Amino acid sequence: MGKYNFTALRVRQTALRQHAAGKIRAPPKWLDVVADIPPAQVLVRNQAPQHQLVRQRVKTLPGTSKPQVVFEVQEKRIKPKKASRMFLPTEIKYEEDQLRQEFFRDHPWELARPRVLVESTGKDSEHYDWSRLQQPGKRLDGESVVQRQLWLLNNVPDMTKSAAYDIARREFYRLRLQEDIERRVAAEEAEATGATFGPSLLEVGMELENQEYERWKAWAKMEAQLLDQKTAAFTGAPEIAAADDAVEELEEKVPVPV
């Protein structure tokens, strides 16, 4: 039947023929079950449904005095697909993905901070009150800024994306500065009570730079000596050339006896 294989659909007919031909002694026990509930014979594959991104906003509509919750549907561009890509699974998108991409594009070094990747249900952010950025039991990170911005967009009337981003970033910078000050004060208090710390990151960097400079200086000295030796091989050693010049000057000054 061309490129279609109907062997699985005709398993009952095959079993009946084998039993009639004597290849199997007794019919299989599932023979009547397959007769009552036959396999599906749908050969047409349905295309996966395309879902749209729905966003919740609080807006003051014209003619109303109080803000209302409005659900907006983001218009999705309909792009022609190739036949080979028509039945691919639908891409799952959330509004947080765009906010997360924008934040980490502006703050790439936040990805270098250690993070806790253990989650219980994958919805840990729903267990916090994002009316404030700092949460008890959770470290301050980029995900906090994303959830705080999303909360502002969903609950503050007439809030724009850029304004929510500015508010969340301002709170984030203030808390990061507070953490830095607390860290410095704790280090100063520990040093005042006799604690000793190793070299700082700046001191470690300077030491590595000094080691690299000394290594380069030794290499440059050796290269200079090799270059001098190559030059002397063609023109003679500088000491020999100076001695020859002195002999020539003496010969010119002292008259040769006749």
Swiss-Prot record:
Disulfide bonds: none
GO cellular component terms listed in the entry, alphabetical order: mitochondrial small ribosomal subunit
Main localization, broad class: mitochondrion
Record keyword Ribonucleoprotein present: yes
GO MF: structural constituent of ribosome
Top-level division of the source organism's lineage: Eukaryota
Cellular localization per UniProt: Mitochondrion
Subunit structure: Component of the mitochondrial small ribosomal subunit.
Name of the protein this chain belongs to: Small ribosomal subunit protein mS23
Lineage: Eukaryota, Fungi, Dikarya, Ascomycota, Pezizomycotina
